[in-house]
Amino acid sequence: MSREPREVVEDFFDRMEDDDRRPTIGELFAEDAVITVPGTRFEGPDAPEEMLDFFGPPRYEWAAKEFDRWITTGPHVVSLGTLYGVDAAGEEFDDIRYVDVYEVREGLIRRLDIYNDFAAEGVVE
């Protein structure tokens, strides 16, 4: 039996917060996964790695999430909260809103839609 959708998403977040485990996030995604971020889209087996490259330097030095709440309905999991970290110029930022929407089927993330206020708050251009 596959894991519940929220368990898979929480595993994803745990791995993203751990430098040693971050490269293993691909194990949590379906081969035909689709990841969308404002302005770009990643598809297929390389989507998780491409997403990691997209969000790494020089976009910003680092960022982390502070969770506010989870909404789960069937295969869909929504995570809401704020982001904090250090931008590409070395300036700290915090309280940047985000919403991540996941579709998890058969224990794998099939779709991830990422929304945040980085551009609106001037963290990235």
For the regions a language model picked out, list residue spans one by one.
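Hydrophobic beta-strand positions in extracellular immunoglobulin-like domains
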Residues: 83-85, 104
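A short hydrophobic beta-strand element
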Residues: 73-83
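Short beta-strand edge/turn micro-motifs at domain boundaries
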Residues: 97-123
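Short, low-complexity N-terminal intrinsically disordered segments enriched in polar/charged residues
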Residues: 1-31, 123-125
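Short, surface-exposed coil-to-beta transition loops
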Residues: 63-65, 93-99
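A solvent-exposed, acidic/Ser-Thr-rich amphipathic alpha-helical stretch
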Residues: 3, 22-75
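Short, cysteine-centered beta-strand-loop-beta hairpins and adjacent loop/turn segments enriched
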Residues: 60, 85-93, 125
